[in-house]
Structures are given as C-alpha cells and as structure tokens.
A protein has these predicted regions:
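Rossmann-fold NAD(P)-binding glycine/threonine-rich loop
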Residues: 1-10
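C-terminal active-site/capping subdomain that shapes the small-molecule cofactor and substrate pocket
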Residues: 114-212
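C-terminal and late-domain segments of enzyme folds
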Residues: 61, 65-154
C-alpha cells in the first residue's frame, strides 16, 4: 500500500473505521488517564448480524479485528509510563454473529476500574447502534478530505495522511512513529491541519490572551 501510494503520488490514511465499541473506548480511556483512574480489566462483547459479523465468524478474520481493537487501550493508557495504574489490566474482546440483529449492532462493555487507595469501581456500557449509519458519514468525510489531500501539494507529498487518524482503528503513521489513538488529540490534529492549510492560527486552548 505504501509503495502504491508513492508510485502514484496518492494519499493514504488508515484501516478499519472507528464507529462502535472502539469509538467508545477512545472516548473513555483518555478520561481515565487524564484523571489517573486505574484499570483492572475491560471486557467487551459485540452482537451483530450483518455481513461484517458473518465474516468475523472466521477465526482468521477475527484475529485481525481483535488485534486492532486490543491495541487501542495500550496505546492510549501507556502502561509502561503508568505501571501502577495500567501495568496489569486484562483486556478481552468477543464478537458474536447473531443474524436476527441484522445491521443493529450491540457493544457491551464491563470496565473494572480503581480509584484513590485502590478502591474498586465498575462502569457498564451498552451501546446499541446501527453499523452503517455510523460508518456512512465517515465515508463522506473521507471522500472530501482525501480529495483535498490529493489537490494540496503540501499534503499529497506526505503520502500518509496521519491527520485523518480520527476516523480509524488502525491509523497509518510514518515508519517508527507512535500511533495516536486518543480521540481528542486526533480531533485537534484534524482541526489544526485544516487551519494550517487555510493559513489560520492553530488552536491551542491556552487562553492567556483573555486575561491580558
């Protein structure tokens, strides 16, 4: 893919849209990390009855999906930097094909966290959603942004459009570069890239100018 991109001077950006359960993880996990809330375990199960669910019945296909889902928490929580909080959490992901559910996907999460003095707590999330309804707007956004990247000499020369990682479970990055999965950092990078292209001041949220 990288070679094709270089050969054709075409932009590339990522794999596997971030629409359901992984979207929720990339919203919640940065909050835990920001408040230094520890994590003992995160159990995730999915019920879906569309073609995606049928394909994921195959162990080989599920393995690829599982790897992209599992990697998100480690990249966000950085257990090597915060071993007392995130150095030993258990992360399980299950996907169940259930034809009566059709395109209506259910993502259920049990999250075991702990706070000050190690006191355990739990969070339960039951996300009942529609797979295609969540994915379709991403397709529309990416058509527009990839067209912009193709027309922009500055972006086209990059090849990998890391600024579009906001939309993906597996964003593409330059070789050896740490992939960013925090949804809010991804959104800031997306907005600032667009502002940079327009020659506008980048968003920092510093806010000191309000108190001059």
């Amino acid at each position: 893919m990288h070679e094709l991109s270089r050969r054709n001077n075409a932009p590339i950006c990522g794999k596997d849209f971030k629409t359901g359960q992984t979207l929720i993880k990339t919203i919640l996990a940065p909050g835990f990390k920001a408040r230094m809330i520890g994590l003992n375990g995160w159990f995730s199960t999915n019920i879906l009855g569309n073609r995606d669910g049928e394909v994921l019945e195959d162990p080989g296909s599920f393995k690829t999906k599982e790897e992209s889902k599992l990697s998100v928490l480690e990249h966000i929580l950085q257990p090597e930097l915060y071993p007392d909080l995130y150095g030993n959490f258990t992360h399980k992901v299950r996907i169940n094909y259930y034809p009566p559910r059709g395109d209506n996907k259910e993502g259920w999460d049990n999250i075991d966290i702990f706070g000050w003095l190690g006191y355990p707590m739990q969070i339960k999330v039951d996300f009942l959603c529609r797979d295609s309804i969540l994915a379709a707007p991403i397709v529309l956004d990416l058509v527009l942004f990839m067209d912009l990247a193709q027309r922009s000499a500055e972006l086209r020369g990059l090849g990998i459009q890391e600024w579009l990682s906001f939309y993906f479970k597996s964003p593409m990055t330059a070789p050896g570069l740490y992939p960013e999965h925090d949804l809010f950092i991804q959104l800031m990078k997306l907005k600032n890239t667009l502002r940079h292209l327009r020659g506008e001041e980048l968003i920092t949220h510093l806010g000191l100018e309000y108190y001059d």
